[in-house]
């Protein structure tokens, strides 16, 4: 009953959000309804003849200079029962004429020739492009925001023009043009604002504060914001930062999981400079593969997706790396408990070519090696252990500017993890026959990615980007065993060895292109296309075995292998960000994609639309619809994203995943630097995959397609966000109320069941406060309703009799003596306890000579040491379900209720790191 009531309440809110602006829309359209209706069917006539007929039907008079209509060609014009305003707009759109209706008078004037001002907005200190900077004309308040490469284009009437450029965290500046009558290139350099006092956020920056643009479910994070978030082991992490935003579930305690608006782990598209990343985890998910020292900023989309993005259902994380300083050399070095970080940037050719390199490496293996060596040395029991884990990241960016119009860049990312472990038993001095018995295992995984891109300003209104991309992910699990007994050459000598290897990989190669065309200040048109060649090796297993001496043999073979799968993916897209009216802005786009695999071609048409209705200067209503398609899936053994999980494409049997999402919400700005939003959403998903009951992704069993069930899902909810982006105190408060469920015909008898991360409530509070120029305090508190999992809540004894446990008198536990069979009644039938945690961080800045800086970071993860459950396991003891006391005459029904134990692994964890900037 409670769930039904909450569903109705949520839908009522959602409907209210959608229909709230209707009165305003009706009021706006009232003028159109009052307009006279015009019907014309005229062929090869002069424009004055058309105007005379309109005057007759509408009862209006046209006022214009006689020279305005001279030497205009004859036209054919046809409308049927159309409002006067719309009729005139269509009539004059192909003429250099503008009109204005004033009562019964229609004034015609010559359209002024337009001039275009275009260029780049850059950081004055480094010449790096500033993404999302605001450039606007003061008098008309017409403006533009820079694209992902810092480019802007403004088309304005000629004359006296005053431009204003601004970007949060930088000093704004203005430019005056007197009687400007030609297209002009203007490259703007903004100076970083080092002052502590509040940065003024102008009305033109409303785009960045989400009131004026059409974007929904979108957040932008700078490197500074990411670093200001309290960290685990002193390691800043973009995924951990995203986990603190509304609508995002983190999954398992401490790991870099991302489950967005009821989606799955594989529904997130991670991009580094436009190139997809398939495995984002280090240390099993404690850290992500994104080195914060290499990041310039990132855009996070979870609704209202622009048409240029595709390939995943749930979200897009678009990461832009640093371009490199073209003026001076700068760098930083960080020492933490888990890893070290070194970055360097600077000019190769001043103001022409720059580089940026960032290297991160863990030293868990370095720190643990002496301890393991000492332990092995002091042990006298004939046993040695070996354990090693290490990871590294390398980010490299080369950036060359041929001219103000042309630029080329190369971006490289390489990240690898290595985990090795094992042990060896060997004979001691007391034993007569020497022997060794060793077992060793290793797990390796990593990404290698490269992007070669070229950007070019074709003219003042057209900007283009073309890039070639390469991306490879692979993992390998290897296990070996070696046994030697006796002395080689003697009769009793024998030796055997075996090795098994399992690997998975995915490789992409392709071309991406995108273009920004700005015909006027009312339109920004983006279009382009992608082509990718995929190569999948979902599973390759090999075994080797050999023996000598008394055990002579040799064998090499495959045990279960999926063949290589090749697939081709292509897409074209187009979108128009259009200021329809001063208060109405529309972003309409479409994406068409094709995926060819196993001689089967799938096509998807993905329409996208977002609108913004400006109710006041500081308040807007938005609504959006987006269809997303996904052609690849991630298959694994658990809910933790393991390196051994395999990416698989759609097949002849399994169709592409599709989601349709509608969103609506209000956005409000207060006192320049505060922004508030409330969004409601409803998302339908189909062709989802999950394992059938009793199956998992294990080698040597049925083909993977046969293990999968195909079903549907839905998620809906409301998200609230309050954010402050400037001043001494910054941060956000976010709350999410959401539902998410699934339905598969072959799972749970076709009944709906809650999704794994169906977290009803989520609350996040993130605060950063500058106590002074040298001290910054950060805090983050999160609360989430418990995750769900499938457990056997009852067990059945097949044979034997129930006996009272010796522990019964203390614990009221029963212990079955026969074979016990687990009973699974529903999928995801158990909800874990709520999750909550407080993290604190302290940054101490120590200025040095010549602009150098030392930064101490002290972090405390899980301040009050809440042992949030990481896993649940079943106890060996059982509780009887019929609640009979010993000695009761009632027969035992054969069912028992198990006792469960919750395991938490992340207590309070203090950490410290030191960064030296030069």
PLM region spans:
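Gram-negative outer-membrane beta-barrel transporters
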Residues: 682-684, 702, 706-793
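Transmembrane beta-barrel wall of Gram-negative outer-membrane proteins
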Residues: 338-361, 377-422, 442-464, 470, ...
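C-terminal beta-signal and adjacent terminal beta-strands/loops
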Residues: 366, 774, 783-809, 818, ...
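Outer membrane beta-barrel strand-and-loop segments of large Gram-negative receptors
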Residues: 504, 508-510, 560-565, 571, ...
């Amino acid at each position: 009953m409670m769930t039904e009531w909450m569903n109705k309440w949520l839908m009522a809110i959602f409907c209210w959000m959608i229909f709230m602006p209707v009165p305003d829309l009706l009021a706006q359209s009232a003028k159109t309804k009052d307009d006279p209706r015009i019907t014309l069917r005229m062929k090869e006539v002069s424009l004055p003849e058309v105007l005379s007929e309109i005057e007759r039907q509408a009862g209006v008079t046209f006022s214009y200079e006689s020279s305005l209509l001279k030497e205009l060609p004859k036209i054919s014009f046809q409308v049927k029962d159309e409002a006067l305003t719309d009729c005139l707009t269509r009539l004059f759109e192909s003429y250099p004429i503008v009109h204005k209706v004033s009562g019964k008078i229609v004034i015609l004037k010559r359209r002024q020739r337009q001039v275009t001002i275009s260029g780049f907005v850059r950081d004055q200190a480094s010449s790096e492009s500033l993404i999302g900077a605001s450039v606007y004309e003061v008098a008309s308040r017409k403006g533009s925001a820079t694209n992902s490469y810092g480019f802007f284009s403004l088309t304005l009437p000629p004359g006296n023009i005053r431009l204003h450029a601004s970007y949060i965290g930088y000093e704004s500046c203005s430019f005056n043009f007197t009687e400007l009558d030609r297209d002009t290139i203007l490259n703007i350099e903004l100076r970083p604002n080092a002052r502590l006092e509040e940065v003024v956020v102008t009305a033109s920056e409303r785009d960045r504060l989400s009131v004026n643009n059409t974007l929904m479910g979108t957040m932008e994070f700078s490197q500074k914001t990411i670093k200001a978030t309290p960290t685990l082991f002193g390691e800043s992490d973009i995924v951990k930062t995203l986990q603190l935003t509304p609508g995002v579930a983190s999954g398992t305690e401490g790991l870099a999981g991302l489950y967005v608006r009821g989606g799955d782990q594989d529904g997130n598209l991670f991009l580094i400079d436009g190139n997809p990343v398939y495995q984002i985890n280090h240390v099993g998910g404690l850290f992500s593969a994104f080195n914060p020292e290499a990041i310039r900023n990132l855009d996070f989309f979870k609704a209202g997706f622009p048409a240029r993005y595709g390939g995943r259902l749930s979200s897009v994380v678009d990461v832009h790396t640093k371009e490199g300083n073209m003026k001076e050399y700068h760098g930083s070095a960080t020492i933490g408990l888990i890893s070290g970080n070194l970055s360097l940037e600077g000019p190769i050719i001043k103001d022409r070519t720059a580089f940026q390199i960032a290297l991160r490496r863990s030293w868990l293996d370095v720190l643990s090696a002496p301890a393991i060596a000492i332990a092995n040395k002091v042990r006298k029991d004939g046993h040695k252990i070996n354990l090693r884990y290490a990871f590294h990241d390398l980010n490299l960016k080369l950036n060359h500017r041929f001219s103000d119009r042309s630029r080329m860049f190369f971006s490289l990312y390489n990240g690898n993890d290595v985990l090795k472990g094992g042990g060896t038993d060997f004979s001691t001095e007391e034993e007569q026959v020497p022997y060794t018995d060793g077992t060793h295992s290793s797990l390796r995984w990593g990404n290698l990615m490269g992007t070669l891109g070229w950007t070019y300003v074709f003219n003042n209104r057209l900007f283009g980007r073309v890039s070639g991309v390469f991306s490879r992910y692979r993992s390998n699990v290897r296990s070996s065993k070696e046994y030697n007994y006796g002395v080689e050459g003697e009769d009793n000598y024998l030796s055997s060895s075996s090795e098994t290897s399992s690997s998975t990989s995915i490789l992409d190669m392709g071309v991406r292109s995108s273009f920004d065309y700005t015909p006027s200040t009312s339109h920004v048109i983006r279009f382009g296309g992608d082509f990718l060649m995929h190569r999948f090796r979902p599973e390759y297993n090999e075994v080797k075995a050999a023996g000598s001496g008394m055990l002579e043999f040799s064998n090499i073979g495959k045990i279960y292998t999926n063949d290589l799968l090749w697939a081709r993916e292509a897409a074209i897209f187009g979108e128009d960000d259009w200021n329809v009216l001063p208060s109405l802005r529309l972003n309409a786009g479409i994406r068409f994609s094709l995926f060819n695999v196993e001689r089967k071609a799938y096509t998807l048409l993905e329409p996208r639309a977002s609108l913004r209705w400006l109710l006041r200067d500081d308040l807007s209503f938005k609504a959006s619809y987006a269809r997303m398609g996904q052609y690849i899936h991630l298959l694994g053994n658990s809910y933790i994203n393991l390196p051994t999980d395999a990416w698989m494409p759609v097949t002849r049997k399994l169709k592409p995943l599709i989601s349709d999402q509608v969103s609506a919400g209000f956005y409000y700005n207060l006192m320049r630097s505060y922004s508030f939003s409330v969004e409601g959403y409803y998302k339908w998903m189909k062709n989802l995959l999950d394992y059938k009951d009793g199956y998992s992704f294990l080698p040597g069993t049925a083909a993977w397609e046969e293990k999968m069930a195909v079903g549907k899902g839905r998620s809906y909810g409301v998200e609230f966000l309050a954010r402050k982006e400037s001043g001494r105190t910054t941060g956000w408060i976010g709350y999410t109320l959401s539902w998410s469920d699934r339905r598969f015909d072959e799972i749970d008898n076709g009944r709906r069941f809650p999704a794994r991360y169906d977290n009803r409530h989520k609350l996040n509070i993130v605060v950063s406060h500058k106590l002074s120029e040298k001290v910054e305090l950060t805090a983050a508190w999160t609360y989430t309703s418990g995750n769900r999992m499938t457990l056997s809540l009852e067990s059945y004894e097949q044979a034997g009799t129930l006996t009272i446990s010796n522990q019964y008198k203390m614990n009221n536990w029963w212990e079955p003596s026969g074979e016990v069979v687990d009973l699974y009644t529903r999928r995801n039938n158990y909800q874990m306890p709520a999750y909550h945690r407080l993290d604190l961080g302290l940054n101490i800045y120590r200025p040095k000579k010549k602009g150098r800086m030392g930064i101490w970071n002290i972090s405390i993860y899980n301040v009050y040491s809440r042992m949030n459950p990481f896993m649940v396991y079943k106890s060996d003891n059982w509780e009887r379900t019929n609640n009979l006391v010993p000695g009761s005459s009632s027969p035992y029904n054969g069912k028992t209720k198990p006792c469960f134990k919750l395991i938490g692994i992340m207590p309070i964890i203090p950490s410290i790191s030191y960064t030296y900037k030069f």
